């Protein structure tokens, strides 16, 4: 359920970006950016990511799967931790900057180089992150790699 919140929330963020097309009111632009920020930080994405991390931790600690017993588990740990760190140090700050800029200068944000940079980075890497998370979901379901050889 946590991964559904994480991926579903991230897809929702991408969908909200497309509401910006044709906007002529700075208040509406700020409202969309604030909504994106709220869905990400408070309601769905971050709680889903934390829930996924905690669920993985509990399964690894209290089941026969372990932490790195299988290659697919190692892959999932790497992706999960990388995605959380990338979201924390890059996607989140880009998103916050967009909200702050549009709150200050309104519709002029759409021609502001800092706003446009943050929007481009967030959209491009946010889309990439969603795709990687979906691939990771399929890896979790299919468990494609055999367990590591025991030494």
Functional labels for PLM-detected ranges:
Residues 1-151:
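Polytopic transmembrane helical bundles with strong interfacial aromatic enrichment
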């Amino acid at each position: 359920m946590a991964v559904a919140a994480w991926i579903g929330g991230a897809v929702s963020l991408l969908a909200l970006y497309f509401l910006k097309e044709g906007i002529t009111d700075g208040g509406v632009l700020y409202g969309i950016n604030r909504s994106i920020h709220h869905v990400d930080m408070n309601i769905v994405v971050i709680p889903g990511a934390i829930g996924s991390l905690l669920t993985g931790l509990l399964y690894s600690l209290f089941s026969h799967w372990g932490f790195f017993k299988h290659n697919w588990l190692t892959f999932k740990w790497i992706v999960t931790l990388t995605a959380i760190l990338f979201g924390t140090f890059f996607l989140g700050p880009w998103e916050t900057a967009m909200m702050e800029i549009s709150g200050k200068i309104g519709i002029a944000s759409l021609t502001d180089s800092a706003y446009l940079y943050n929007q481009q980075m967030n959209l491009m890497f946010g889309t990439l992150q969603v795709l990687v998370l979906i691939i990771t979901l399929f890896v979790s379901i299919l468990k494609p790699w055999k367990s590591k050889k025991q030494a």
